Amino acid sequence: MAKKQAPDSRPEIYVSTDVEADGPIPGPHSMLSFASVAMLADKTVLGTFSANLETLPGAAGHPVQVAWWKTQPDAWAACRRDLECPEDVMPRYVEWVESLPGKPVFIAFPAGFDFTWMFWYMMRFAGRSPFGWAALDIKTMGFALTGRPFRKSVKAAFPAHWHDPLPHTHIALDDAREQGALFCNMLAELRTRETRLAQLDATSIETSESDSSPPASQPD
């Protein structure tokens, strides 16, 4: 009989990840640069990983993305220096994630874009994903917290106190830090709301029990 494993009591580690690419999908196009910042819920940074990648053989930039990169000369220059081949980088990245002292959770804004790229590259060049199939989308979290329509759940519409004074430069490491701090602030608000609701529920139960108690007997 198989021995039952003890529950994993390690904390969740939020791996905020930003991808810079030259097109909408991997394969026909290439991931140019990516970065991850591993954070605890209180914004403690446990480590970072970043790399600039050589383009895929036979791939080419999408015309729309190529035109956009021409408007971002500093970010383009930053992601085209010290290039490494994906075959070397992705196994190293997966091992870095697996070495974190907790349960890694991939987070991004929007996760649908960044996780598509990272999952494809991890499976293609490392053969596994330390995140499984799952990613946490910060945009969806904002949609749930604000009650705004999903397509209007954009960073600019979020409350000012969710934003730390960090730059968003389209340089992967900068953007991973910025969105990671945003997520942690949103998570803190979620936890505060949960605590308040729990306190309200407890008060409601106490009031209900008090109202249903029989009246004290009167002396003869």
Per-region residue spans from a language model:
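Conserved non-catalytic scaffold segment of RNase H-like nuclease domains
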Residues: 3-15, 20-109
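Substrate-recognition/cap helix-loop segment adjacent to the acidic, metal-dependent catalytic center
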Residues: 97, 112-133
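Acidic, Mg2+-coordinating catalytic module of metal-dependent nucleases/exonucleases
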Residues: 105-111, 116-117, 154-220
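Active-site-proximal helix-loop-helix substrate-binding element of RNase H-like nuclease domains
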Residues: 55-58, 66-70, 136-177
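Residue-level signal for well-ordered alpha-helical scaffold segments within enzymatic catalytic domains
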Residues: 92-95, 99, 116, 120, ...
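Acidic active-site catalytic centers that drive phospho-/nucleotidyl reactions
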Residues: 18-20, 114, 137, 175
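Substrate-binding/catalytic groove segments of enzymes
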Residues: 125-129, 148-156, 190
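Glycine-rich, phosphate-binding/catalytic loops in enzymes
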Residues: 31-35, 122-126, 190
